[in-house]
Amino acid sequence: AVIGTDYRALERMLSKKTDLSVLTVNTDGMELYDKGEEKAYLALFEKFSDKNEESEDMNDKDRPHIGIIGMTPQDVSDLKAANKIRKVYADQGMRAICYGMGDGLDEVRNASLAAKNVVVSPAALKAAQYLQKKFGTPYEIAYPLASELVPEVNYQGKKILIVQQQVIA
C-alpha cells in the first residue's frame, strides 16, 4: 500500500525534537533498493555538502582526497571493502573517503575538497554528477577492488552473465 507522508514536516519535527540534522527521502516501497539509495545519496550531498576552501592551516585529514560514492553493504558484500579501498589509495599516497561505509557527515560536508570521486555502484552516479556540477569535481565509474574479485581466466570470445552489481562486474 502507498500512503501519503509529509516528509518535510516529519524532518522538521524530528530535527526540532532531537536537535540533530535529519534527512528524509521520499520512497514508496514499490521500487528496488537502489532507487531509494540513489535518492538518499543525492539528498545527502544536496543538503550537507558545502563549498570549502583549502587553506594552509588545514590538517592532513581535511586536505583533498578521493571520494568513494556507493559503498554500502547492500552493493558491496565484503564488509572489509572500504578499508581495502582506503589502503589501495593510501598506497598511492592518497586518502580515500568512503561515503556510506565508515566515513561520517563531516566528510560529506567536506565533499568539495575531493580531487575526484569514484562511483562504485549505479545508485551513486546521480550524486557524483551533482557534485561535478556544484563543485566541478570530476568522477569516474570504477571499482578499485575488481581485480581481486575476478579470477584470472581468458575471457576472450566468452559470454558473461552479470548478476547484481554492474560496476563491480
PLM regions with names:
Residues 1-169:
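An N-terminal assembly and electron-transfer interface module characteristic of large anaerobic redox
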